């Protein structure tokens, strides 16, 4: 009976290590993913962010968009709503859309925020698309994509399925209970020596690694319990194989991290069938359970991934940038009053009007 208890504990540890941080995905390829039970974020309202007005404080200008995205995600989580940050480039024209149950209240945090409701928005279908999961340790993702002029017909979508505070507490309790059970079997007594017999403790199988994994996850849950968590995935696609490979390299490069703790989930990706909808999350089967391909992330990390660019681009204009910052991305503007045509914008071929 004593030996059987250790065997059951070792088996539970192996199963836990395979499931935590999506390690089971390492043995799968895209052909193992299912789409019949795929889910899509439930979004009722889409809003396009066209730009905002910078302050005179560069540090504040860098913090405000992150705070706005974090507030948007936290509000969605408290309302039990999914959220999607959708970035699209079409011939270098940039579109940034935020989707959730209600329009985001960015204007309360971003000065001069310009947002437009986009009724009946439907994401475009691309020739080739994929899904990427992992810990969202990334900064200025939108800038990296927008600034790459070789990416002319692509999209990325950061999908966020927030956990309620109650779900986080339940996960914390489940992990804590399992941790207590595994700790009791992490080591076993062994008799060493013949003439001078002594008892030493040795680790049992992978139980110590499972204990460390649980400790890291519990620590992460407790540290960020007040700000929230979400299951996330990044869907992305392009109009050609060349652009798809370039976009994939950019995304994986942007999500590199020096974090080597057991709670850190490495980046994994799969190229999907063209029939998979652009915001769908496919499934995989693990231990006879159907699991959706998502990663557990803090809302704060998800917010950083959903942050708009810190420079102007065609289709997205930051008011107050210096001339040398704005020049490559200057866009045509229109005045509601008297105006005089002074030329044609190179990027958009639209008439440029000078207000009188």
What is the meaning of each model-derived region?
Residues 1-334, 339-345:
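Extended, folded cores of ATP/NTP-driven motor/assembly subunits in large transport
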